[in-house]
From Swiss-Prot:
Ranges of compositional bias, category Low complexity: 153-173
GO molecular function, one term: lipoic acid binding
Segments of this protein annotated with the region Disordered: 75-111, 153-178
Residue span(s) of domain Lipoyl-binding: 3-78
Protein name listed in UniProt: Dihydrolipoyllysine-residue succinyltransferase component of 2-oxoglutarate dehydrogenase complex
Amino acid sequence: MSSVDILVPDLPESVADATVATWHKKPGDAVVRDEVLVEIETDKVVLEVPASADGILDAVLEDEGTTVTSRQILGRLREGNSAGKETSAKSEEKASTPAQRQQASLEEQNNDALSPAIRRLLAEHNLDASAIKGTGVGGRLTREDVEKHLAKAPAKESAPAAAAPAAQPALAARSEKRVPMTRLRKRVAERLLEAKNSTAMLTTFNEVNMKPIMDLRKQYGEAFEKRHGIRLGFMSFYVKAVVEALKRYPEVNASIDGDDVVYHNYFDVSMAVSTPRGLVTPVLRDVDTLGMADIEKKIKELAVKGRDGKLTVEDLTGGNFTITNGGVFGSLMSTPIINPPQSAILGMHAIKDRPMAVNGQVEILPMMYLALSYDHRLIDGRESVGFLVTIKELLEDPTRLLLDV
C-alpha cells in the first residue's frame, strides 16, 4: 500500500494561516475517496479536506486547534482496498440482519453527509445525529430537523419541573463554561475594534415610508414569483436604491488608502448575513448590472451557502459598501459599525406602523428607520445626509428605481 499526504489546501494571499477545526476520522478508520476527513477553519470560511483515494487513515499529524499554513501536512492516508472490508466488518458488527445492516448503512452514509453547519450545531448541543430523524434528501439531517428536536427537548423536561415544588438551586449548582473563541469570532472582534479605533465614525438617521414598496409587492409579487421563480423581497429594492445613491455620491463608494482616496467605479455590495458560525459579509458583485430577480437570487444563494457553511473566500472578499438588516431580528434602530476598509454601512430596520402627519392629517403608515454610519475623515455631512435622503426618496417612489430617474 502506498502512503499519501493529507495537505492543507492552498490558502488565498489574504489568509496567512488556518486552524484545524474537526477531524471526522481517527487513525485506523476506513475512508472512501472524496469523503471529508478534516475541516480547516480560516478567518473567513471553513474548508473541507476530502480523501484523495480509498484507504485507511494512517496518522493524524496535526491535532484539532493547531495552527497550520498552506500545503502543510495534516496526516497520512494509506491507500488500499481494505477500506471496503473494514466498512463491511463494522456494518456486520452493528447489524446482524439484512434490514439492520441496511439501516446501519443508511445512517452511516447520512452521518458522513452532514454539512459542517449541522455537525457544529449537533456538537454545540451535545446531540447524537442518529437520535434525530432526517427529512432531507435520502433521510439526511437538515437544520430544521435539529431545531425541531431542540424545541421538543425543553418541553419534555419542563413537565416534571412544573409539578415539583419550586426550590432555590444550591450555590454548588452554579457553574460556568469556558470555550475558546473560533477564528471567525476572533477576527470579527478584531475588525470591529479596528473600525472603532481607526475611523472617525459617525451615524446619521432618517425614516422612510414603506407603503409604496409594500403596495408594489402586493400587486406584482405573485406574478414576479411565477415569472422568475423567486419571491420579490425588500432587499432587492434596498440594493437598487443603494447603487443609485452611490452613483450620485461617489465619496461613499470610496476608501482611504494611506494618504490617498481610492474611488471605485464598480459597485460591489456586501450583505451582512448571520450564520451558525457568526456574522459574515458575502459580496454581491457588479450589482448595477443586475435586475431585481437576479439580486434576489444572488442574495438567496449566498444566504443558503452561509447557512450550510459553504461560503468560499472569494464570496467574502472585496465589497465597497455594506448593507445590514437588523429588522429581520426585530431591531427598531441601531448604529451599525463600518466594515473596513469600506467607508460606510447602511442599516435597515423593522417596519412598524406609526402615526404620521400627512398634509395636516394623521395617518398610520408602515415606517422604517434608516441608519448610515460613515467615516467622517472622507465623507462630510452634505454627502452622508444627501446619500440617505436619496435612498429615502427612491424607496418612497420605487418606480424611479425602474425608470432610472
